[in-house]
Amino acid sequence: MERRKVTFKLYPNARAAERLTSWIRLHCELYNAALEERISAYQKIGKSLSYYDQQNALPQIKAARAEFVELGSHALQHTLRKLDLAFQAFFRRVKAGQTPGFPRFKASKRFSGFCYPDPAGWKLAQNGTRAATIRIGSGKDAMSIRARGQHRFGDSAKPNDLTITRKNGEWFASVTLRVSEDSCARARTGDEHRGVDFGLNDWATFDNGETIDNPRFVRNEMPRMADLQRQQARKKRGSIRYKRLGKQVAKLHERIGHLRREFLHQTTTRLVKSCAVIATEELRTQNMSRSAKGTLDQPGRMVKQKAGLNREILSAGLSMAHHMLAYKAVEAGTRVHVSNTRQLKPSQRCAACWEIVPKTLAQRVHVCTHCGHTAQRDQNSASVVLIDAHTPGTGVAARPKPLARQRAKSKSVTRETPATASHDA
């Protein structure tokens, strides 16, 4: 069984929205109380409380506070589990010598939502093509909320968990489905072998010279973003107008995110449908987008320029594109080969003679000093990773096996159903 997440937009009425808001407030209160309990226990008696210590106290909490009963035991346990995971991540970073980031108290307006970690306490019903209903709770206190969205996995998909989130005044429900391999299989319409070099000048360059333009969603919205932030800076902090402009800034960030995901979903889907082999190189965007500020003793150089470059790297969504290619390739029976960048050096290696030709980042044309081969820098890199994909025993990623459906019918064509209300995934 495979797992796939589908997101629905919720349309609760005023009473349901007020009730959901109160539930988020209670989950936030539980999270903060559990965090305070852990801190106090360590400060007073030197004891570190575990998840199970706090989970065992839930019956007493529900007996003293009746409003916690309707939230459901499993949802309350998941909130405590979130705090436990935050502490595990904190101790892991301390051990690794990284910036620790101690878990912090959360304001209810910034608490994103809550989760039902199993199918108990809620139900999803698909009504027609794009309409759905999500029922939360049981008995006479249960509430039904209209939702918009659909999935392409059919009636055989079994709901696994539900996450309710509030974002910029809107409500969403993310449902994890357990589906069979046949249900999530994608039809592949081509058998091309393509090398891809992801970048910033062009979002993608292929070994045959074709390119995909970089949409630059953040850069296109920067004038509007700067204008809103200037207006907000002139308002009194905490005032109605200050908050109103803050919501507009958040909406603009959300719009940029939606445009980016839409572009990535459509582009990666089109790519895995047309290719039997996709070759690319390993990208570590976290390292690529590190700050150049430095320290007080060793201040960084060209900090503003590096900040602008980091913004462009993150705006391109290259890491998200790799993730989408990985799971969609499994569904379509496409092999994705990820070359080891440090060993292969695709931007410095000649695709014709395989010799290393050092170049600076400003040199956009590859001219080999050994064999005279000339090509665009990104096209040459794409050709190098494609050759590497055809070399046995190379690459850093496991090669996914085709699903049963693709082994038998790799060229069948079926109509794709959008995985969510907003994009075709």
Predicted regions mapped to residue ranges:
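Residues on one face of amphipathic alpha-helical coiled coils
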Residues: L26, L30-A33, E37, K82-L85, ...
